[in-house]
């Protein structure tokens, strides 16, 4: 689906070209694949595919690592990574206009958020994937909060906005409606554990959500709708923030079912 939405014009070949001469069937196959790509180009004629919403993946690299921000060594499986890489895989073939923006982009031009419907922040806390120390910048946090409060959507996967600062682990805890327990709030009463399996995001799910490695010690704040919790650890939640909406998901390995759920999460958050 990704190739149909935006045809590629390069096929990577690793190895010595002279070795390919020893395998004429391989050369013939490459020729046939090239012809398939040419046919796609001819049929699509450079048109822009239909896009339901405008989505931006927010990390420290922005456009510099577009589509490759969770890919390690030819996208090989890694236990620490696959629960996040699925988000990028899903976006590549989904009917969205996808951009990759950095925190520096927002710092330099907060108005760029006005051109978006949903922001996605994916990864572990204090990494370039989620932002780390950038979350101490009040200009950036206020711009993102304002974006959601005025009607934008925010999808957080893993430990979004994760950076210990001013008494919070998740700097957008009030937006996401969830926080991570690290021992500092053990004595806080936590009453919100009721699940809402009939929520719009899960309405057509025909199997339980696969969160991959998931996350431990995530709890919901008051007013948050928990979609899935396991052993009193929130795996998926939805939260209204002003006119906007936010969704928290602990992990999204790639699968058809997970893609559908993330698709519905984006639509719900953008409403």
What are these regions (language model features)?
Residues 1-80, 228, 250-251, 256-259:
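Hydrophobic targeting/anchoring helices
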Residues 44-54, 58, 87-91, 111-114, ...:
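Mature N-terminal, pre-catalytic/accessory segment of carbohydrate-active enzymes
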Residues 88-112:
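A short, well-structured beta->alpha microelement
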Residues 111-123:
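Short acidic/histidine-rich motifs immediately flanking catalytic phosphotransfer sites
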Residues 130-207:
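A glycine-rich, often tryptophan-bearing local segment used as a flexible ligand/cofactor-contacting loop or short
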Residues 181-261:
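Catalytic beta-strand/loop cores that center a nucleophilic Ser/Cys/Thr
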